[in-house]
A protein has these predicted regions:
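ABC ATP-binding cassette signature C-motif
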Residues: 1-209
Length: 209
């Protein structure tokens, strides 16, 4: 990614909700790749609304927004919506779903070597295995379990086998934050990310960012 490249800008953005309440008025904002920006304001000042507009979640605004479509945006809401049927580990793994899928495909390919194959089938399988190996190495997939464990430990997540349905609001936020950080978005939007984090976790997050 090129330094000093503007990857997002908004021009004259306003947000009005019924009956006629102005939440945001005539906002101009641009930021470069790699920039770290804090949005400060009193409760109800429109901070969360601004982040939702940047994240593309709230399309109901006036003004103009331009951003590079090649960049992935990740957003942590104050009250994340997580699947209550999943475990903590299930949700965290969603942040590295592409790698998880590649590992599964790699295991399926390896399992096929136990079958009776023609020479052509064997050659195709070897070629496919090589392609998957290259992709996995590029993504440091062999260290995935360690990476997940370190992130979950740093953010003091509950037991990986715990159901999302039994977690408190603060625990859900930490799970969602862990998933988001592991997904490594180009634009990371965090709405009050240090809420429900202890001092050590806050320090880890600051170092990570």
């Amino acid at each position: 990614m090129a330094d000093h490249k503007i990857i997002f800008s908004m021009t004259g953005v306003s947000k009005i909700i019924p009956p006629n309440k102005t939440i945001l008025k005539d906002i101009y904002l641009s930021f470069f790749y790699g920039a770290k920006i804090g949005v400060l304001g009193l409760n109800g000042a429109g901070k969360s609304t601004l982040l939702k507009i940047i994240a593309g979640i709230d399309p109901n605004y006036n003004g103009k927004i331009v951003f590079d479509k090649d960049y992935k945006i990740g957003y942590l809401e104050q009250e994340p919506n997580l699947d209550p049927e999943k475990t903590v580990l299930d949700v965290v793994k969603e942040g590295v779903q592409e790698v998880v899928d590649l590992l599964k495909e790699y295991e399926e390919v390896n399992a096929r070597f136990a079958e009776e194959l023609s020479d052509d089938e064997m050659n195709q399988l070897i070629e496919k295995q090589g392609e998957l190996t290259d992709k996995l190495e590029q993504r440091d997939a062999w260290n995935l379990e360690y990476k997940l464990e370190m992130a979950m430990d740093a953010l003091r997540l509950p037991d990986p086998a715990a159901s999302i349905s039994v977690l408190s609001g603060g625990e859900r936020r930490r799970v969602a934050l862990c998933r988001l950080l592991l997904s490594e978005p180009d634009i990371l939007l965090l709405d009050e990310p240090t809420n429900h984090l202890d001092a050590e976790s806050v320090d880890w997050l600051e170092q990570y960012l």
